[in-house]
Amino acid sequence: MYEYIKGEYMGINKDYIIIENNGIGYKIFTSGATMSSMPCCGEKIKLYIEQIVREDFIGLYGFESLEELEMFKMLLSINGVGAKAALSLLSISRLNNLKYAIITGDEKHLCRGVGIGKKTAARIILELKDKLKTDELLNCIDEFDDVTQDNSLAVSEALSALISLGYTEKEAEKVLRDVDKSESVENIIKSALVKLMG
């Protein structure tokens, strides 16, 4: 139903961002990669959108690039992979690293995603391996960074947000040790995501 949305970026709230368009604030679920690239509040952005409608839920999922949106749709086509798991896979590493993991059959990497077990990881590899261009292997570098608990409320909220994106508490804590804790929750999350995604 929707192709994209343009509007003012209003901020991050755990696993979604808010974009205001014509006086309406849209709640848009997104990946760590898209979250980490958000501009300052009030600046204009454009996200490519996928709407998911279920009996008990209607949600908008937005991505900075068409390539990431297409990968999201491909992941959703796999039996056993829901929107939360797909976003988690797109949040644990950069898009090219995810493709590299699928092409090379790296089940261990895929199992880092929320709700992704060995069987689901194997299914993702089996069904998507041939759909991804093997020449993309040349552009994919498999690198992994590992997200900190602090007494401050801001860091605690950032930790919760990173875990909801699919990172383990250990990963979240590790990265948050190195961020500037005097920043806002939003900037702490952005800094952590940049570190996590290399």
Curated annotation (Swiss-Prot):
UniProt key word Metal-binding: no
Gene Ontology biological-process annotations: DNA recombination; DNA repair
Region of interest (Domain II), ranges: 65-143
SUPFAM superfamilies documented for this protein: DNA helicase RuvA subunit, C-terminal domain, Nucleic acid-binding proteins, RuvA domain 2-like
Gene Ontology, cellular component aspect: cytoplasm; Holliday junction helicase complex; Holliday junction resolvase complex
Annotated stretches, region: Domain I: 1-64
Region listing for Domain III, in residue ranges: 154-198
Main subcellular location: cytoplasm
Pfam families: HHH_5, RuvA_C, RuvA_N
Record localization: Cytoplasm
Quaternary state and interactors: Homotetramer. Forms an RuvA(8)-RuvB(12)-Holliday junction (HJ) complex. HJ DNA is sandwiched between 2 RuvA tetramers; dsDNA enters through RuvA and exits via RuvB. An RuvB hexamer assembles on each DNA strand where it exits the tetramer. Each RuvB hexamer is contacted by two RuvA subunits (via domain III) on 2 adjacent RuvB subunits; this complex drives branch migration. In the full resolvosome a probable DNA-RuvA(4)-RuvB(12)-RuvC(2) complex forms which resolves the HJ.
The record's note on its domains: Has three domains with a flexible linker between the domains II and III and assumes an 'L' shape. Domain III is highly mobile and contacts RuvB.
Family: Belongs to the RuvA family.
Name of the protein in its database record: Holliday junction branch migration complex subunit RuvA
Underlying gene: ruvA
